[in-house]
Amino acid sequence: MGHATGECTVTESPGQKGARLMTAGHCLATAAERQAAVAAASRGDLGPAVLLPGSHLTVWHTGSQAWVFGDGAGVVPVYWREHEGGVWWATAATPLAALTGAPPDLAWLLADLTLTGVDFRLQIAQFKGVRRVPPGSALVFRDHAVPDVVRLPAGPRSTLGKGARRLRDVLTTAVTRRALAAERVTTDLSGGVDSSSVTCLAVAQKPVLAVTYTDARMAGDDDLLFARRIAAEVGGITHRVIDARDAQAKHFDGLEDPDALPTTDLPSMSLGVLPMLAARLAPAAACGSGAHLTGRGGDNVLAAPSSHRVDAFLAGRRLQAFRRATDFARVCRIEPWRAWRQLAATTATPYPRALQRLADQLADPLPATWRPAPIDALAWCSATAAASWLTPAGRRAISQLVSSRVPHAGGHTAPGALHDRLDLEWMAGEHATFDAIARQLWGVPIHAPFLDTAVAAACLSIPPFERARPGVYKPLARVALAQLVPDWLLTRQTKTLFTTSVFDGLAANAPALRRIIAGSRLAAAGLLDARQAAADLESGIAGAPAPLGALHALLVAELWLTRLTTAATHTAWWQPAPQGSIPCP
């Protein structure tokens, strides 16, 4: 949805009548690469089409069949539904829901708030009756039958060295072609490895305006120091530092009037930081940036989830797994035996059984003082802090949803690889909503090269336990980006936290946030206890320990539900065709 004519390209097959490849979105492929993909697809090999550079929708039409798929991360998703004797599909779920007035799926929303390690999305969308095509799969139309969802070809597993060489090539392509395609290019320059690497690759092609955001809490941390050093030592960078104190922006500002907020297809964490994003993107908007490049997704593909230790054990690297579990316990400040016990339990438990245990756990009331434990990161699946807000009806809904995933879970044999994919899909959705908001409000297109299909595939082809090294931050980046970015950047060992800034925002915006929780639609549906959520909110407002991530997610979920009253109506998306509605092929 929403792709301009210039973002859509069609390539015909010279040897197969009626066969053509169409892409919509940020496809960075050359004419030669597209022709090679068409030739391979004509022979039955969709691999080259899947890995065309960029992040986009692809439709391969043979005349008798049509294969429709988004990117491998989920930035450009595909949704579909049956209606009026036909099949309708789109790259957004909201218009398909508006077609029939389908309501949001509140169990889906609860799952998004309360579960980790559960693939509850799979083929389920955020609206009832709307189905989702999982990233890495295609919606396949044959004649007039109901379409099939078919897995697309995936590449082989790689070693760190081989994957790093591939990453070096595809990431350079992803950034370089974006930089060359836009007249004016801007970048995020947080000072971290990810955004700094993207900035360095972009400025190798043309001068860029790089923006660093800071505030009173972050000004003395390493991010700003590294960003300034990058700007000073790498030629071609015009550096702007945006200080929240000057911009008068805090977390959760601007939420007093939900009807004035931008609409998104999914709940978006960006709604909780809108004025901060506005300040950060103001220089890009002012200069007419045609592409604002970010490092989003870098943490997902360059690093590894905590559960990589379990994958190492399952791959036969048992001593390595226990040593890394000991390191994990030290960082979490817990006894090593607790991490060892969870490691052993996870390796001994198949994923379907772990799901059923979680479903059984959620069916019963949680203790009043319950909070997720650090060792949950080593489990297949677990509940988040938001699970403590569920009512009996909410617990039943989530328990049933988790149980429904059990029959589909047998193919997963390693939790680290599963968490890699789920975390990547979540970040892809977040990026897509951020991009939609930035285009709506400030006219700035946001790019995340690390989320491109080819880039993510190169990284995730390496087992997660290979992408982690004790005492080495993002070892994959060190190997892949050597001599492309300054060596001292790749040896950075610190990461700035934003916790204190979040507390400041909660306190400053307490009245508006209290109103959002008090008017909770999930609570009105009997699924969530607003009093318990409000108690955690009050703790955060007072600067006491609180589940900040869960509160942020709940607030934006409630805002999303509020906006749907006008954003998901039929008239907002559809108008009658002169001769009646025409279903998509």
Language model segments and positions:
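Cysteine-centered catalytic environments shared across enzyme families
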Residues: 1-248, 526
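Glycine/proline-rich, flexible active-site/cofactor-binding loop segments
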Residues: 14-22, 26-42, 63, 374-421, ...
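Structural motif
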Residues: 43, 47, 99-108, 410-423, ...
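ATP-dependent adenylate-handling active sites, centered on carboxylate activation for C-N bond formation
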Residues: 64-67, 75, 155-393, 438-484, ...
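Charge-dense polyanion-binding interfaces
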Residues: 91, 106-107, 114-115, 469-491
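Short, hydrophobic/amphipathic alpha-helical patches that form generic packing surfaces
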Residues: 110-118, 275-282, 422-433, 549-566
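PAPS-dependent sulfotransferase catalytic core
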Residues: 306, 484-544
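Acidic, carboxylate-rich catalytic segments that either coordinate divalent cations
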Residues: 519-585
